[in-house]
């Protein structure tokens, strides 16, 4: 989907340094100082307009959340939701997922969320998918031994691709649902895309996985 460019987005984000972290590389290994506590850190890669990450931060004050979205014109919408949520455990970062190791130390992130990521359907774009082994290698370094990846999508092809990619990477699949909203899963917080697609009758796919390090 084409994103409308907002030339004022960067300046708007920088008006709120308590929420928007302009230079996340400066805090690699020191995110506890940013939040002022030792609570676990969960990140959402591709946080879009921020409904999910703001909802999670509000529902779980004992966890620190960082929403990561590389497009500032999109992230500025997440900023508005963060301001409205008015929670101390949420920060926003504008970075490409390929650069995450520049922002976080090994094992510094307790959990990763991938919600409605771009499916990149063309074969030549496979490596751009956030569940591609190239990215799994990055996630493995960021997560501790017990760390998990939680993935949601409405795209069955991407979900099937991800199941195979995770399995071939020798990850342990701890939860799989082919119709999340009609399952027994509790505590789901919807994204904007999730509300849109589920309202049209599309099933939502979800999986949870962790790296097998035994």
Swiss-Prot record:
Keyword Membrane on entry: no
Catalysed conversion reaction: guanosine(46) in tRNA + S-adenosyl-L-methionine = N(7)-methylguanosine(46) in tRNA + S-adenosyl-L-homocysteine
Binding residue positions for S-adenosyl-L-methionine: 44, 69, 96, 118
Coiled coil: none
Pathway(s) the chain acts in: tRNA modification; N(7)-methylguanine-tRNA biosynthesis
InterPro entries named among the record's database cross-references: SAM-dependent_MTases_sf, tRNA_(Gua-N-7)_MeTrfase_Trmb, tRNA_methyltr_TrmB_bact
Molecular function terms, GO-annotated: tRNA (guanine(46)-N7)-methyltransferase activity
EC number(s) recorded for this UniProt protein: 2.1.1.33
Keyword vocabulary terms for this entry: Methyltransferase, S-adenosyl-L-methionine, Transferase, tRNA processing
Active site feature: 118
One GO cellular component, as annotated: tRNA methyltransferase complex
Amino-acid positions noted as binding substrate in the UniProt annotation, renumbered to this chain: 122, 154, 191-194
Biological role stated in the UniProt entry: Catalyzes the formation of N(7)-methylguanine at position 46 (m7G46) in tRNA.
Protein family according to the UniProt entry: Belongs to the class I-like SAM-binding methyltransferase superfamily. TrmB family.
Protein name listed in UniProt: tRNA (guanine-N(7)-)-methyltransferase
Gene: trmB
